Amino acid sequence: MKRVTRSIASASVAVVALIGLLAGCSSPKARFYTLDPDNTVERASTATPVRVVVGPVTIPDLVDRPQIVTRVSANEVKVNEFARWAEPLKSEISQVIAADLRTMLGSDQVTVVDTGSNAMPAWRVRVDILSLYTEPAVAVSMDALWTIQPPGKQPAIAGRSVVREAVAGDGFEAIISAHNRALASVSRDIATSLRTPSGR
């Protein structure tokens, strides 16, 4: 009986050791990231009395996925399984542009959804991201076409923003910060058109 007891005890120790080994070899947990309005954007000293609805926003199929896609070389990209967007990237971009415009225009009437409950006519902003390249520790490059549709039958206003923001450091936090600044540059171009006489 003593020999049997020792065998069982030895087997138990082996099982515990194996479980510990497997736990140590398990895949790392994914981390989730969100975009934010650029914290260097200052609120307009004079408000622009305008209601704006941001959307739709389109992005390239390459980056339209939960994983953050980074560029390895001219013809190679990396789909980062353990670095993911907390929300669909299109939704993140539209919300950040709307938040940037609220600050830049000094208007709280900038949304991503038109409820139709406001009597003030809305200006509609469509943004088509033609390319979005992320080079870790180097730069985020963005090429965006945007169209402002005024209320009524006024002609649309079209523009293009080509932006390159340096990634100041290693890691995904630095990458996200560069995305935020790139979107702020796009928002700044849109806000300028909304403020000009031809844009209002």
Regions from the language model: what does each represent?
Residues 2-13:
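Bacterial N-terminal signal peptides that target proteins for export
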Residues 26-43, 47-48, 104-152, 167:
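Surface-exposed short loop/turn segments
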Residues 49-119:
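N-terminal segment of the mature soluble domain
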Residues 55-57, 68-73, 145-147, 151, ...:
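Generic beta-structure capping elements
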Residues 21-24:
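C-terminal motif of bacterial Sec signal peptides marking the signal peptidase cleavage site
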Residues 77-86, 152-188, 192, 199:
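Short secondary-structure boundary motifs at beta->alpha junctions and helix caps
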